[in-house]
Regions:
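Structural motif
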Residues: 10, 257-259
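Short acidic-rich active-site patches of cyclic nucleotide enzymes
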Residues: 59, 314-319
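Bergerat-fold GHKL/Histidine-kinase-like ATPase
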Residues: 92, 103-257, 264-313, 321-535
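Conserved short loop/turn motifs at secondary-structure junctions
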Residues: 27-29, 317-320
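Divalent metal-dependent catalytic cores for phosphoryl transfer on phosphate-bearing substrates
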Residues: 1-142, 198-204, 250, 270-281
């Protein structure tokens, strides 16, 4: 766990000095100090472990004639600290891969501009019949919580170092609350909040950089940890071997791009027939997002991956980076079967989860993921065309056995479960799940945060609380303050505002924002004319 913390935390913070550097006003300091020195000095004063400080300080390879070789090069540490040197190598290599994914090589007619800003990735999108935008558009370096819209570079060119200074002062204030004990996921959340609109580098050519520092740090952490897992699984000795050459290989298929997709979403949400069905739609829509989150949590735990490895998870789909090891591939297959067995018990054949993986090299990551994305998509399409084939093959008799037809729920039409009173009209009986979805839909507009309960922890919910269990993970939704035990919490209304000490994992969950209206009737009343939606 200590090594994982050093690798992941060191990778997440390896370029923190870039933000500090840009916030400084004295050119003399900038001339004498490099960003890795400034970052390491801050990390040491903040109380981070020495290994993390050294990762930040020495994550660039230097020539032996560099005047700061002894201070900043990983090789200068010598063979006495091979474990640390290898850890620095793996972060440095991941940094190089991430940079290759994001930018052209330094050289040519470019120049460094510490006050350059981030360019929107959609700047090159040209609508049919429209002229491309000629003037450079930029994001101002602001927090993710601020309203930020792309503007012409000429409109916002002044006072940029002051904006960087504000960003750093606020980020530093939050990090210093518990720098040594901060959870990986909380650190990632804070970096997203403060570096989402900060460019990863300041080397300018014709185009401004369009990759954020946040995404660079996140990618570096993901690649570094997956590289470490791959090498250890293939027999390297981290503490006794000099692994620089092994770490630097770019032609081995060391990584897996894992893709997942949930089938049956539209029918799950909308194919409902009864007077109470509409009141379950909000809850069902949210539930699917929570289901994907639970699957992601299950995969990360089973594969021993940090959340930095999650590329995307929403809308019924997920993508993540994993090491290409036999154990990882077996785990991916096992988790898929585990999820589908659970889905079958809960919903019959209504929902099915496809999960596939495609190997890729370090060179492939740096070069571009287009072909790999395509192959993952093709594999998912094939997998979705043969739903339940494993389950049918393994247990044909049970899968096609007669099922009880009594106690059919009038909303979802699932049978065989004891019906309970409908939360809105008690004389109307529905299955327990549909009743929960109605309650969830009622609670969501008033929930600003919800909690993931510790495994095995029994919490007695209050009358206004709702506890949902998804894939064996219990989530507590409450309208009131909750100070009980929690394995982590999800921020809904204010996605980046920490509510607990930094050692408690925090995640944002903006897809749960339902604060505009509690009911469709309320939305209708806000309109003009006939009381119809869309009229």
């Amino acid at each position: 766990m200590t090594l994982r913390r050093n690798v992941v935390t060191g990778a997440l913070l390896h370029d923190i000095g870039k933000l500090i550097y840009r916030s400084l006003s004295g050119n003399d300091i900038k001339r004498r100090w490099r960003h890795q020195e400034i970052g390491a000095l801050w990390a040491k004063e903040a109380g981070f472990p020495d290994d993390v400080v050294q990762i930040i300080r020495r994550h660039h390879f230097l020539r032996r004639n560099d005047p700061k070789y002894a201070e900043l090069s990983p090789e200068a540490l010598g063979d006495e600290k091979l474990s640390l040197v290898n850890t620095i190598y793996v972060v440095a290599h991941a940094d190089s891969i991430a940079a290759g994914m994001e930018r052209e090589r330094v050289g040519g007619d470019g120049y460094f501009d510490p006050e350059c800003m981030l360019s929107p990735v959609f700047k090159d999108v040209v609508l049919t019949g429209k002229e491309p935008v000629r003037e450079k558009l930029v994001w101002k370096p602001k927090k993710a919580t601020d309203y930020n819209y792309p503007k012409a570079e000429s409109e916002v060119a002044a006072g940029i170092s002051g904006l960087y200074r504000e960003l750093w002062q606020e980020l530093n204030g939050e990090l210093m609350q518990d720098p040594a004990g901060i959870a990986e996921d909380t650190l990632l959340l804070l970096l997203q909040k403060y570096t989402f609109f900060v460019p990863e580098h300041t080397y300018v050519r014709e185009e401004l950089p369009d990759t954020s520092l946040y995404h660079h740090l996140k990618t570096t952490a993901a690649v570094a940890w997956c590289t470490y897992q791959y090498l250890v699984a293939n027999g390297t000795c981290w503490e006794r071997e000099d692994l620089r050459a092994a770490i630097g290989k770019e032609d081995e298929q060391r990584y897996l791009l894992v893709g997942g997709d949930l089938s049956g979403i539209q029918n799950f949400i909308y194919t409902l027939a009864s007077k109470g069905a509409l009141k379950t739609v909000r809850g069902r829509s949210f539930y699917l997002e929570l289901l994907i989150e639970a699957i992601v949590s299950r995969l990360l735990a089973a594969l021993d991956l940090p959340r930095a490895c999650v590329v995307y998870a929403s809308g019924g789909g997920l993508y993540l980076l994993a090491p290409n090891t036999d154990t990882a591939k077996e785990t991916i297959s096992f988790v898929q079967q585990e999820v589908n067995r659970w889905l079958y018990r809960q919903f019959g054949t209504g929902l099915y989860f496809s999960l596939v993986a495609e190997p890729i090299t370090a060179a492939g990551l740096a070069r571009g993921l287009g072909e790999t994305w395509y192959r993952v998509g093709q594999k998912l399409s094939v997998e979705k065309e043969r739903k339940w084939y494993r389950e049918i093959k393994e247990d044909y008799a049970t899968f096609f056995a007669p099922r009880p037809a009594e106690n059919t729920c009038p909303i979802c039409h699932q049978a065989g479960k004891e019906l309970v009173p409908y939360p809105v009209e008690e004389e109307f009986l529905v299955c327990p799940f549909c009743a929960q979805m109605v309650r969830l839909g009622q609670v969501l507009p008033e929930v600003k945060v919800f909690y993931r309960l510790p495994a095995g922890e029994k919490v007695a919910p209050r009358a206004s609380d709702l506890v949902l269990e998804v894939l064996g993970i219990s989530y507590l939704f409450t309208r009131e303050d909750y100070s009980g035990p929690a394995a982590g919490y999800y921020l809904v209304e204010n996605p980046w505002s920490l509510l607990r000490p930094a050692a408690v994992p925090a995640w944002n969950f903006p897809t749960g924002s339902y604060f505009t209206c509690k009911e469709l009737d309320d939305l209708v009343k806000k309109g003009m004319g006939a009381e119809r939606i869309g009229v």
